[in-house]
Every structure is written in structure tokens, then in C-alpha cells.
């Protein structure tokens, strides 16, 4: 952790004139505490993180502004069992497959959202079937990774509940100009 704290985590985002500006990494607990008005979308990338992440969310009273997801069904299932529905979770690949092939069936799901890529390997993923599945099952729909105004337009026209982006300032400017 000491070594990570030395790295300038924001250097790629600064103008040349601001290269001496320093942005360090923060722990999840610090981020949830410092940015206590922001919503967080957390992805369990490694096994064994579910309990740690759950405890941090509880300690920082961030239950109502955090969504936890994972591409790994087992990691997600572990978190769902721990949180007992107290913290929003997004489906894994498994639920996205169900949505694609059985879009009109009501399911007994233990998740509250689905996340899907805008385009995957050149194919449009967000579809009417996916939107219908989310509506039938009372799920939020979040699309990732959307980085330009044209695609922001498409997501909003489509009725997405959330947009994940690598360009948060660009998205904020777009939303301010188009709301």
C-alpha cells in the first residue's frame, strides 16, 4: 500500500501545466467516506473480497448508494448471501444470458440491476429484449462503457437507468447541456 500511495494516480488526466499536481490512490473506505454523496458501482474482481467489501459498505453507511457486481457468479452469489438483499447487486454473465434467451419470463432473481456493454466485439448488446427483461423483472439497466455524446444520446433514448463511462466530466457536461 505504501508503494501505491507514492504513484501519481491522476497524471494521465492532467494538462501538461499541471503535471506536478499529485493525486494518490485511496482505499475504498476512504472513497466511500470522502465522497459520501456519490453513488458507487463496485466490481468484485477477486475471490475473497465479498466479506471485506460488505463490511466496508456497512461501516461507511453506504448501503443505499452502492451497487455491487461481478462477472463471477460465485463471487456475486457470496456477496448476495452476505448482504441478504440489503445492498443492491447487479447480475453476472449468467443473468445476461438468461435475459437474452428468455426475455419475456418473470424470474425469481436475487439481483436488482443488469449491466451490459453498449457494444461487445462489434455487436450491439443493448436490445429491446434486454430492456423488456429488465422491466418485467423490475431491474435497473446500466450500460457500459459509453464515452461519447452520440452514444450518451442512444443510452438515454433507450431508457438506461445508468451509464458507466471512462469520461465522467464529458458525461456530466453532456447531461447539463441536454437536460
Predicted regions and their residues:
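Solvent-exposed loop/turn segments at secondary-structure junctions
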Residues: 47-48, 96, 170
Amino acid at each position: 500500500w505504501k508503494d501505491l500511495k507514492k504513484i501519481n494516480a491522476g497524471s494521465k488526466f492532467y494538462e501538461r501545466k499541471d503535471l506536478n499536481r499529485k493525486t494518490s490512490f485511496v482505499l475504498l473506505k476512504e472513497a466511500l467516506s470522502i465522497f459520501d454523496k456519490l453513488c458507487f458501482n463496485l466490481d468484485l474482481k477477486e475471490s475473497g473480497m465479498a466479506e471485506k467489501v460488505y463490511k466496508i459498505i456497512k461501516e461507511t453507511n453506504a448501503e443505499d448508494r452502492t451497487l455491487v457486481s461481478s462477472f463471477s457468479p460465485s463471487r456475486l452469489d457470496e456477496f448476495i448471501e452476505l448482504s441478504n438483499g440489503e445492498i443492491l447487486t447487479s447480475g453476472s454473465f449468467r443473468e445476461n444470458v438468461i435475459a437474452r434467451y428468455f426475455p419475456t419470463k418473470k424470474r425469481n432473481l436475487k439481483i436488482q440491476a443488469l449491466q451490459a456493454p453498449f457494444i461487445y466485439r462489434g455487436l450491439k448488446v443493448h436490445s429491446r429484449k434486454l430492456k423488456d427483461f429488465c422491466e418485467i423483472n423490475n431491474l435497473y439497466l446500466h450500460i457500459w462503457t459509453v464515452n461519447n455524446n452520440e452514444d450518451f444520446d442512444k443510452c438515454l433514448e433507450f431508457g438506461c437507468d445508468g451509464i458507466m463511462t471512462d469520461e465522467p466530466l464529458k458525461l456530466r457536461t453532456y447531461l447539463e447541456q441536454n437536460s
